[in-house]
């Protein structure tokens, strides 16, 4: 009896059965050198356990970038990639790294978390390394075709068409803040905020009508940079525009003052001088003359800025909410600590990506993912949505317009 062919087949197929994940497709995220972040994308083609493809690194403002080719392998639960050569490069601070990732998966996305390190090729990185994190959304399964069933085309009523046409004439502004690294050694650095901020910016600019020139992106800003951004918005935003503000980083609740604070990168644990209070944030939101302002805060104790309020909807009601000014906040929790690895932002971006309607309110998006956050957070995290106190809210709601 000859067993050699059987053993040969086992040798070929056993590695695939141990780790059968298909990495083919588009991955997007960040890499970090010191305290500086850049955006990284990989377009992977997989054959067996071998990988190849093209990638890009670019600065957060998009002005400097490099494009490159790579190959790699899947080794058990690790993905190992070697960047080979540039196809295009603008700027002088790029180098070609080796990348090592560990794969993980959640309900909403697949992740590659790891590091980049020195690479012994022409233009390769030398004696430097840093963190890297990529992700891609888990695609919804396409429904099976059903014989003799005709799906009616989705049609908007006149109210919906009016709203879409009105929103097309408006500008959508965004201030997106991610603080991962702190100067004070007594304040623990965070892994995710800048990565999450980049992820949200990409979703807003790709799927909704937020143009790049109207997005202010702040990576590890100090207090003055945040205040200057608020000042700029107060000058540029008009009474017909929409404004979204996102903050991810440390938050602190002062029980004596009964006040919450954001911690910019230059905050000190021993002094509140560089902290930004909820009161200051509220005052700026009130001063910015937008039609609708939506504040999204993914930080500990972020719920202290608002009063919870129920949301509802249909086309006619949505038009009425659009007509009325609003100052709303969506937060990752109440007066509790929240984890660095954010389930909140994961489900927020998932629902923004998967929304197929031309217009959707912030309240509708929130109601779709609130229960998922509660059910999938380790500490019973309860996200909040409601009115920002004393900020001139008149009962409206922020309306997203899909491209």
Label for each model-derived stretch:
Residues 1-23:
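Bacterial Sec-dependent N-terminal signal peptides
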Residues 10-13, 97-99, 194:
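Short, charged low-complexity linear motifs
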Residues 7, 105-107, 150:
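Intrinsically disordered/low-complexity terminal segments and short unstructured peptides
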Residues 133-403:
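Cysteine endopeptidase catalytic domains of the caspase/legumain-like
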Residues 21-137:
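Central antiparallel beta-sheet cores of small beta-barrel/beta-sandwich binding domains
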């Amino acid at each position: 009896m000859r067993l050699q062919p059987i053993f040969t087949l086992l040798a070929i197929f056993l590695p695939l059965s141990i780790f059968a994940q298909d990495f083919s497709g588009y991955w997007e995220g960040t890499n970090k050198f010191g305290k500086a972040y850049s955006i990284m994308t990989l377009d992977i083609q997989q054959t067996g356990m071998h990988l190849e493809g093209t990638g890009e690194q670019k600065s957060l403002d998009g002005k400097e970038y490099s494009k490159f080719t790579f190959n790699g392998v899947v080794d058990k639960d690790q993905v190992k990639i070697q960047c080979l050569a540039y196809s295009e490069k603008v700027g002088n601070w790029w180098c070609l790294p080796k990348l090592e990732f560990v794969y993980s998966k959640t309900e909403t996305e697949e992740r590659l978390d790891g590091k980049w390190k020195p690479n012994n090729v022409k233009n390769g990185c030398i004696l430097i390394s840093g963190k890297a994190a990529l992700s891609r959304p888990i695609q919804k399964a396409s429904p099976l075709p059903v014989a003799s069933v005709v799906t009616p085309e989705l049609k908007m009523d006149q109210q919906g068409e009016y709203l879409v046409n009105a929103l097309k004439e408006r500008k959508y502004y965004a201030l997106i803040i991610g603080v991962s690294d702190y100067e004070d050694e007594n304040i623990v650095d965070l892994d995710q905020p800048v990565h999450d901020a980049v992820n949200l910016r990409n979703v807003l600019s790709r799927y909704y009508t937020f143009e790049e020139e109207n997005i202010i992106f702040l990576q590890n800003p100090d207090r003055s940079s945040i205040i200057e951004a608020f000042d700029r918005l107060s000058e540029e935003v008009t009474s017909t525009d929409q404004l979204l503000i996102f903050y991810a980083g440390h938050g602190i609740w002062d029980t004596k003052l009964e006040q919450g604070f954001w911690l910019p990168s230059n905050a000190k644990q021993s002094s509140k001088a560089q902290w930004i209070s909820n009161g200051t944030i509220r005052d700026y939101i009130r001063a910015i003359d937008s039609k609708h302002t939506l504040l999204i805060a993914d930080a500990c104790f972020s719920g202290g800025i608002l009063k919870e309020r129920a949301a509802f909807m249909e086309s006619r009601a949505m038009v009425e909410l659009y007509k009325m000014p609003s100052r709303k906040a969506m937060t990752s929790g109440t007066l509790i600590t929240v984890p660095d690895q954010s389930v909140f932002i994961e489900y927020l971006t998932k629902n923004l990506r998967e929304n197929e309607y031309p217009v959707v309110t912030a309240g509708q998006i929130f109601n779709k993912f609130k229960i998922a956050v509660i059910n999938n957070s380790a500490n019973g995290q309860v996200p909040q949505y409601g009115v920002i106190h004393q900020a001139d809210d008149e009962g409206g709601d922020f309306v997203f317009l899909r491209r």
